[in-house]
Amino acid sequence: MNKALGMIEMISIPKGIEAGDAMMKAAAVELVSSQAVCAGKYIVVVVGEVSAVEASLKAGKAVAEMKLVDSLMIPNIDDQVPCAINACNEIGKVGALGAMETFSLCTAVLAADTAVKAAEIRLIEVRLGRGLGGKSFITMTGDVAAVEAAISAGSKLEEVQGLMSDSVVIPAPHPEIVKALV
């Protein structure tokens, strides 16, 4: 079964907790993340069947009201993305290292999904605004050409929306840098 991913971002932590509760009660979805992020925002990320995620998002948005900053629905999310949000993907040997930084939390998730669908890479992490002053970043690994293609695909998507901060491909990262990231 192909899963959908839904995400909402709010500027109120109490309202975010309430919206997350409403999202979970509205439909049979799986909670990926429900947490406070920088700077004083709150995110809720769920996965499930498309109709369930749509119902869940609708309920969350209704509760969030004017506190809603952004929302996202990806109907056919790659399985690596939800795990990367929680930094729990099995990485194995790290080849080339790629990183993208965004100004938007929702667009980081979209960029990660685009990158992993564009090339044969493994997502290491999709860090959503925790300790980053409201930014997000995506790390990935694979062979050099694949990481370059993934970064290019994700970056082009971000540039259209004007929310890409920076990106890099490191063909042979130092083992201590790899250890710090995985």
Regions found by a protein language model. Give the residues of each.
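Acidic, glycine-enriched active-site microenvironments
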Residues: 91
